[in-house]
Amino acid sequence: MSQRMQQGQPMIIMGEDAQRVKDRDAQEYNIRAARAVAEAVRSTLGPKGMDKMLVDSMGDVTITNDGVTILKEMDIDNPTAEMIVEVAETQEDEAGDGTTTAVAIAGELLKNAEDLLEQDIHPTAIIRGFNLASEKAREEIDDIAERVDPDDEELLKKVAETSMTGKSSELNKELLADLIVRAVRQVTVEANDGSHVVDLENVSIETQTGRSASESELLTGAVIDKDPVHDDMPVQFDEADVLLLNEPVEVEETDIDTNVSIESPDQLQKFLDQEEAQLKQKVDQIVDSGADVVFCQKGIDDLAQHYLAKQGILAVRRTKKSDIRFLKNITGAAVVSDLDSIEAAVLGRASVRRDEAGELFYVEGIGDDVHGVTLLLRGSTDHVVDELERGVQDALDVVASTVADGRVLAGGGAIEVELASRLRNYADSVSGREQLAVEAYADALELVPRVLAENAGLDSIDTLVDLRAAHEDGQVRAGLNVFTGEVEDAFDAGVVETAHAKEQAVASASEAANLVLKIDDIIAAGDLSTGGDDDEEGGAPGGMGGMGGMGGMGGAM
């Protein structure tokens, strides 16, 4: 054995099915996977971005240009690609919008990093340079950002409209922006330190098909898209005691399989009487609690429905968990999971009315501390209202972030071009090879205005030249108007973005790129993916598994 080792033969420590790729091959594999994800969504960026049609394994169709929705619905079968998807999810959770921007920048950072790697610049130097650039970019964002008053409704509407532009909600963006800003203002409170806190837990979004999006409205309280369980139940209460129930009002089933042998009609009647008595006891417990209205998350037996109707109690079954949670907020009720422990103290107070035409219940809490509101979105089809809801949810998150953060930026690629210019100036003060990484970072940021122009059918090079010239003249707000093709003041054009979303996009993209660059060795117990093959564009080098559902994806989507 020692003789073989002296002859330079390697020691085999992994199983025969294991695969390993090292150094440049590993970096090339990871960068290719990350860029494939970025390519998949970059055509959706901006007001002129295209939509994607996603068909899942069940045949359900989703049509959207929302970055995080696209990446979540895609069948991604690659560990590196999944890391980039996490960038979009983090951006969505932290800022509510800017997911496509974050992923696109991450992909461009890695593309530029690959060029540096080919120049024999060590990944550690690139990572240090990217960290310096990211930190400097966030400092400059804060310096460039303009402060916004939470009472400035017009500016907040522009933020909402910018978020919705290019989505299905764009056709009615003025109406929807007004509803969104009013909703956010109703759930905003001022903290002791003067900051503003927006509680989006008190904002619910409900959808209804069959009508136009222009008929969407903002309602105080909750909207429950359910019917009463019995036609004889009252549906109107000015002041009602509300019970939220997470227990079925049905005959209790045993935990084990049992068989009952019935030998006579009397035995059958006793059995039925026992079930009826059990249901009657549950109904009596509800009646004794003083509840006028019951929203039950589970089922209600037909006989129990009859008893509740006789007592003049309104009951709704199979209420969504999210609706129960929202009703808890606006009525002050506690959710009861065991009728045996019910007390009057767990009941909430609310007014309840029925919209027979829309088949909806409107529930409005009673009291000074009630702030819950519902955005009722309407559209012609399920596909329309689903995409409308995604657009409104993003805009809602962005407006809430703007109110809490208090800073806005010019959109249309203005902030990216300005940051790139300032980073290039900053690079002159950076020593070593990190300077090249800072410059590469600046180039990556300019991807945003380039893609905005490409997606609008404009010449990206001419557009970038015009933007750079405007910013060199000191026009910090100069951005691309994709509708006219002109470079103009983005604020005057109403293209306004929240600073927090842009900061988060820069931070998330940088961290993801650095995480990928830091990997120099991939060791897999078997194939890295279950699909794809090495001949695909997305295939891995060195015999590694392919990209699965990602192979060649950038061109297919």
Swiss-Prot record:
Disulphide bond pairs: none
Region described as Disordered: spans on this chain: 527-557
Further information: One of either CCT1 or CCT2 is required for growth.
PANTHER family: CHAPERONIN
This protein's name: Thermosome subunit 2
Induction / repression: By heat shock (at protein level).
InterPro entries: Chaperone_TCP-1, Chaperonin_TCP-1_CS, Cpn60/GroEL/TCP-1, GroEL-like_apical_dom_sf, GROEL-like_equatorial_sf, TCP-1-like_intermed_sf, TCP-1_chaperonin, thermosome_alpha
Pfam families: Cpn60_TCP1
UniProtKB keywords: ATP-binding, Chaperone, Nucleotide-binding, Stress response
